[in-house]
Amino acid sequence: MALPIVAIIGRPNVGKSTLVNRLAGEQTAIVHDEPGVTRDRTYMPAFWNGREFLVVDTGGLVFNDDTEFLPLIRQQAMTALAEACAAIFVVDGQTGPTSADQEIAEWMRQQRVPVLLAVNKCESPDQGLMQAAEFWELGLGEPYPISAIHGSGTGELLDELVNHIPAVEDIPETNEIKVAIVGRPNVGKSSLLNAFVGEERAIVSPISGTTRDAIDTVIERDGQTYRLIDTAGIRKKKHIEYGTEFFSINRAFKAIRRADVVLLVLDAVDGVTEQDQKLAGRIIEEGRACIIVVNKWDAVEKDSYTIYDYEKTLQSRLHFTEWAETIFVSALSGQRVEKILELVKTAAESHKRRVSTSVINEVLTDAVSWHSPPASRGGRQGKIYYGTQVSSQPPTIALFVNDSKRFNDNYRRYIERQFRQQLGFKGTPIILLWRSKKVRDAEIGNVNRATRVKLS
């Protein structure tokens, strides 16, 4: 059963995101002294007096301006309100009621959900009561004076809110796969998200950077739940100004860190850029599973060699992610978009997979019999005593050898390929830890001969 939803509504820069962060108990929505910082619907879990619910942060509502993406923001806010069981209308107690507040209040009175009026920026309790009293004229009932930044007054607001929230009992835990969607600005990340969801969930605009928060959306396919995290586009450092974009990029990096699988979205027209390479490096650094999604494939002129040539370019420019699955899609038309989730599920399973020590050593025995470890100039050969998986997410295998320095990069890559080919680790990095160990220590530490690597 889904959690009930509470929509946070208001004009720009009244403190909606600050209130969401207060209710959710963490800074997730981007807060900055700039109107219009929040553009998409951002869902965060909250809890009060035994009731669980989701608070939805929306963009600032402006009814009399159709420039840029303001009509899209209105659509997002309206969609959030349509799925909510209650709404909090946030106003600015320091400025008093405005014509924009009046317009929103008139619209809110026409909605089916109960509306609570939160008068924010009431930092002084005594003055706050007087500031809040001015908002009775909006016709939405009792105004609640609060300070979202300090937390004062929010308890009374929440006490009333939970009266309008249905209790959620026995919510089943979902075995969800967390998927971060990352890439440079304007490569089609939000369009891809919308193609998954089937609605305009994230704002899509040709204006670069229309997504600023890391936004969570939960979908289900064939009994599997996926949490999709759309993120702000990541640009080169020299193009980043301190402010909302700086915080957005930090959000994107955090999204990579908490994801099971990362979709690295590339622009088929632009090809692989230096920034794409750096993003891929960040994904590897965090040890995440990865799918390379080449978007806008419909915009590329093709012949029978196009996809082959593009794959060669990927192998050359992103050679360190050769283990990642690649798919060519069009988020705009939906071409092959659903196939992405199949690859995600496989990669997530590989990412958390554990393999028994006996199976690992069977693979090593075969690998050594096919290709012996290299020998040093003095004729001393490298020996692999045994291997064992020490962790997952990503799969990490410790290999105990006589001298790790005797195994060059080529042989190490060969062993990794053998694990992938024989154990099916698709879409996930594998970490091999080469540990030098004296012969006697290896024998003592590996009493079970069934797990010993047979050396030819």
Swiss-Prot record:
Record keywords, A-Z: GTP-binding, Nucleotide-binding, Repeat, Ribosome biogenesis
GO process terms (BP): ribosome biogenesis
Molecular-function GO term, any one: ATP hydrolysis activity
Keyword NAD: no
Domain KH-like intervals: 353-438
Name by which UniProt lists this protein: GTPase Der
PROSITE patterns from the UniProt entry: G_ENGA
Organism: Nostoc punctiforme (strain ATCC 29133 / PCC 73102)
Binding site for GTP 2: 183-190, 230-234, 295-298
Pfam families: KH_dom-like, MMR_HSR1
Protein family per UniProt: Belongs to the TRAFAC class TrmE-Era-EngA-EngB-Septin-like GTPase superfamily. EngA (Der) GTPase family.
